[in-house]
């Protein structure tokens, strides 16, 4: 049996991933499909945590630019991530995977508060944990949430599951047919090149805590499992210097 490359991962999903072809809102069949992909990996014995963005329901930055108070806009976005987390948790439960939602803002009626020790215990017991409501403070992205929670739970890697994007390029491949895809980068290279994989805070956190980052196409069935079992798909960002350097 092939040994997995990673035994504990944090999967970062964009909110748009839950919207399907609609692009906005939540498409339940799409969520159920993603849940089945995650279940297949979970059934291989991998410990899994999730962070889901809220962009399918709310965008804080344009609301702020339109005149809304930035702090209030960000808190609204955090609530959007909770909605997405609850929907995904329900889909995973129906797929037969014991799942817990933990929020950085207290809302005991719908989710557990984020407690690191409890999250670790859930993972050790084979439960999936979904971290929602960001870090509980405005001005921090769900990318930063992913890097912070991955460090706290000592994840081996953050899997950046993208919609239709199969890795990191030196230019936008949709606009430049000659754009070059990177198979591997270091965190420092990402920061120096200004590649917009995550925001700089999240990239620095990942680098400082030696957490691999894998960017891959979520829309191709089986890709989550392929990444975890070490197949070369997408782009892997590590703290180590590439052999080609």
From Swiss-Prot:
UniProt-annotated stretches for the region Involved in allosteric activation by GTP: 20-25
Question: Where does the UniProt annotation locate this protein?
Answer: Cytoplasm
UniProt keyword annotation of Nucleotide-binding present: yes
What's in the keyword line of the UniProt record?
Answer: Allosteric enzyme, ATP-binding, Cytoplasm, Kinase, Nucleotide-binding, Pyrimidine biosynthesis, Transferase
- Please name the Pfam families in this protein's record: AA_kinase
Catalytic reaction annotation: UMP + ATP = UDP + ADP
What does the record give as EC number? 2.7.4.22
Q: Which GO terms describe its cellular component?
A: cytoplasm
BP-aspect Gene Ontology terms: 'de novo' CTP biosynthetic process; UDP biosynthetic process
Query: What is the enzyme's class at the highest EC level?
Result: transferase
Which one of the record's GO molecular function terms can you name? ATP binding
* InterPro entries associated with the record: AceGlu_kinase-like_sf, Asp/Glu/Uridylate_kinase, Uridylate_kinase, Uridylate_kinase_bac
The family database entries (NCBIfam families) matched by this protein are listed as:
pyrH_bact (TIGR02075)
Job description of the protein: Catalyzes the reversible phosphorylation of UMP to UDP.
- Name of the molecule in the record: Uridylate kinase
Q: Which organism is it from?
A: Streptococcus mutans serotype c (strain ATCC 700610 / UA159)
């Amino acid at each position: 049996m092939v040994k997995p490359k990673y035994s504990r991962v944090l999967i970062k999903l964009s909110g748009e991933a839950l919207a399907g072809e609609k692009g906005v809102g939540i498409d339940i069949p799409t969520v159920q499909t993603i849940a089945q992909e995650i279940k297949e990996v979970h059934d291989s014995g991998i410990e899994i945590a999730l962070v889901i963005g809220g962009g399918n329901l709310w965008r804080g930055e344009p609301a702020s630019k339109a005149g809304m108070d930035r702090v209030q806009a960000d808190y609204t976005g955090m609530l959007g991530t909770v909605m997405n987390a609850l929907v995904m948790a329900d889909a995973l439960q129906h797929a037969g995977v014991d799942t817990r939602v933990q929020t950085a803002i207290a809302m005991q009626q719908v989710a557990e508060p984020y407690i690191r020790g409890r999250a670790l215990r859930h993972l050790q017991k084979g439960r999936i944990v979904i971290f929602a409501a960001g870090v509980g403070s405005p001005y921090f992205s769900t990318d930063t949430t992913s890097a912070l929670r991955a460090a706290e739970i000592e994840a081996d890697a953050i899997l950046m599951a993208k919609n239709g994007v199969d890795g990191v390029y030196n230019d936008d491949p949709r606009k430049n047919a000659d754009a070059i895809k990177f198979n591997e980068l270091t965190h420092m290279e990402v920061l120096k090149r200004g590649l917009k994989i995550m925001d700089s805070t999240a990239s620095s956190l990942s680098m400082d805590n030696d957490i691999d980052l894998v960017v891959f196409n979520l829309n191709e069935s089986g890709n989550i499992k392929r990444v975890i079992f070490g197949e070369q798909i997408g782009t892997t960002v590590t703290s180590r210097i590439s052999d080609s350097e």
